[in-house]
A protein has these predicted regions:
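A short helix-loop-beta-strand connector motif used in the catalytic cores of GNAT acetyltransferases and
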Residues: 38-49, 53, 58, 126, ...
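Short, high-confidence coil segments that cap the C-terminus of an alpha-helix
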Residues: 45, 107-110, 219, 277-281
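Conserved acetyl-CoA binding element of GNAT-fold acetyltransferases
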Residues: 73-86, 246-258
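Conserved acetyl-CoA-binding loop-helix of GNAT-fold acetyltransferases
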Residues: 84, 89-103, 260-273
Length: 338
């Protein structure tokens, strides 16, 4: 079967959303597509399509993220949504679309790119497209139900579950006031700058990004701030997912100044309250600082056996992808499928 490649334009949206609903690992609604690709404050994404007879049969997309890379803010293009109609698999659809996207990303000024591939796309990225494997990201978890742990070990699916009904109450936890946030402001910009000291390379965390990524999202996220003496000491974002038969709450983001373990514990306590009773576990990718990891251990978290694939590729001759295990920091909110 033959196909041609085109850059996305709005007349293709309905067919593209239909393809993602059928075969995509991330099933975007029309509203989610507009939010993710058209309203991203870092710029509209790069979306390449394979089309045949007026139908979208393949897609590969990249989104832009403002990134602190070696201490300097730059804009990286990151592969996100990938899907190929089953009738066209084995014909090089993804490889062709991804190459076109990487050329466009390089032209846009992105010096390199990284992503979190699934088991199907990983060998294509590495063997055909020249990406390199980087240190995998280990997931941490706090079990919330003993029965959930047993089901997971036995490979048995549980109930879907979900977040509790939202509460607007402020609570005093570990000496800090933790309350829901309806909007992020300049105080998060300052907190993000302080937290960045312990993050190495990472997506920039500020009010503009958080407002778009979480509060403007069609998805259900709960955002909380921890306050000490009236000042913002930390932020947590909580969501829920059901993957591989496991009902899990997840910390999409957790931001605190390096060494502020008390703020971490206060935010985690509120996150647990949001998902307890509706999830088997609360999971996250931990911050790199030892004090924050100690706080997570005290709050009942432990490393799991699950590691997420992480790969990268230089797009310019003078760029290098840092292979060190401690060179990058990501949260689950940095993934398009959480």
């Amino acid at each position: 079967m033959s196909f041609e490649t085109v850059r996305y334009t709005p007349e293709w949206r309905a067919s593209l959303v239909s393809l993602l609903a059928r075969v995509g690992t991330t099933q975007l609604s029309d509203e989610e597509f507009a939010w993710w690709f058209e309203r991203n404050p870092a710029g509209e994404g790069i979306v390449s399509l394979a089309v045949d007879g007026g139908e979208v049969v393949g897609v590969a997309a990249m989104s832009f993220f403002r990134t602190r890379l070696n201490g300097v803010e730059t804009r990286l293009a990151i592969p996100v949504n990938v899907a190929t109609d089953a009738r066209y698999r084995g014909q090089g659809v993804f490889s062709r679309l991804e190459r076109e996207n990487e050329e466009a990303a390089a032209t846009s000024g992105s010096p390199l790119t990284v992503t979190f591939p699934n088991a199907k796309s990983h060998p294509i990225f590495v063997r055909r497209l020249g990406w390199i494997d980087l240190s995998r990201l280990r997931l941490w978890a706090r079990p919330l139900r003993v029965s959930g742990v047993a089901r997971y070990l036995l490979g048995r699916p549980g109930e879907r579950g979900g977040l509790r009904a939202p509460s607007r109450d402020a609570r005093t936890l570990h000496g800090l006031e933790v309350r829901p946030l309806e909007r992020f402001g300049p105080e998060l910009d300052e907190l993000g700058r302080r937290a960045a000291e312990g993050y190495a390379n990472h997506f920039s965390r500020d009010a503009q990004y958080f407002n778009w990524r979480y509060l403007d999202s069609p998805r259900d996220y709960r955002c909380f701030g921890a306050f000490r003496g009236g000042g913002l000491a930390g932020v947590a974002v909580v969501g829920h997912t059901f993957k591989h038969g496991v009902s899990a709450g997840f910390l999409a983001d957790l931001v605190a100044a390096p060494g502020d373990g008390r703020a971490v514990r206060a935010l985690v306590a509120r996150a647990v309250a949001e998902v307890k009773g509706g999830a088997d576990a609360l999971v996250l990718l931990p911050p790199p600082a030892r004090a924050e990891r100690r706080a997570l251990v005290r709050a009942g978290f432990a490393p799991t056996n699950t590691k997420l694939r992480f790969i990268g590729k230089a797009l310019h001759d003078d760029a290098q992808v840092d292979r060190r295990a401690d060179a990058w920091h990501f949260t689950l909110g940095d993934f398009d499928f959480f």
